[in-house]
Amino acid sequence: MQRPADPVRVPSAPVALSSASVYPESAASAFEYASRLGYDAVEVMVGIDPVSRDFEAIRHLSEYHAIPVCAIHAPCLLITQRVWGTEPWGKLKRSAEMARSLGAKTIVVHPPFRWQRDYARAFVPGIADLEAESGIAFAVENMYPWRASRRELQAYVPSWDPVGQDYANVTIDLSHSSVSHSDPIQMVEALGPRLRHVHMTVLNDSAKDELLFLLF
């Protein structure tokens, strides 16, 4: 019987609960669960939940439950296209304001959709400019090709894979790497110190992007 690989230990890395993991419950539930289950922090997914967009409400939840906010996930999903307006750079600047007000050091952002042409054209240098202006890490997340029947659709520009792009900070999502059939270990090794943030999940050989509630 093959001996299991030794676990990778990162003592200084906090383990956070994403508010997306408790959907359709609200961000308030994420803070409650994080406190009860012993998480170190919360990642706030800014979305259709009004609480997730309210700086003061999130600050109150963080203080009440004594759980810090470690990251803000910018509203860049299909279902959040109108959250904080429709201008992509405005959304990211608003995310930086929220992160700064809550003491979060990381903003998770997806690469642009192909139809966001002007945004996509300036995305790589624009992210670097935002980091320089704000002092906050904008960690671009790995995505995956969209599949329709037997065809693959490249929905993200410049790429769904951030490893080969000139980003200073990257988020690796293990659910996304599973859907794209990417080797996350190779991605981590290729990124080196550019790896800023990791989205954990329980992989179950599904072709769907799934964030599961993790109990540690």
Language model regions located:
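Boundary/entry segment of secreted carbohydrate-active catalytic domains
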Residues: 2-26, 76
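Active-site acidic/histidine proton-transfer and metal-coordination neighborhood
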Residues: 3, 7, 11, 28, ...
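A cross-family glycoside hydrolase active-site/sugar-binding cleft signature
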Residues: 16-20, 43-45, 70-75, 107-110, ...
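Acidic-and-aromatic substrate-binding clefts and catalytic sites of carbohydrate-active enzymes
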Residues: 20-27, 44-57, 77-88, 113-120, ...
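Catalytic domains of carbohydrate-active enzymes, especially glycoside hydrolases
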Residues: 28-49, 101-103
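Short acidic/polar active-site loop segments enriched in Thr and Asp
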Residues: 40, 68, 104-105, 196
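Acidic/histidine-rich catalytic cores of soluble enzymes
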Residues: 41-42, 130-216
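Short amphipathic alpha-helices and their capping/turn segments at secondary-structure boundaries
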Residues: 52-66, 96-97, 125-128, 181-193
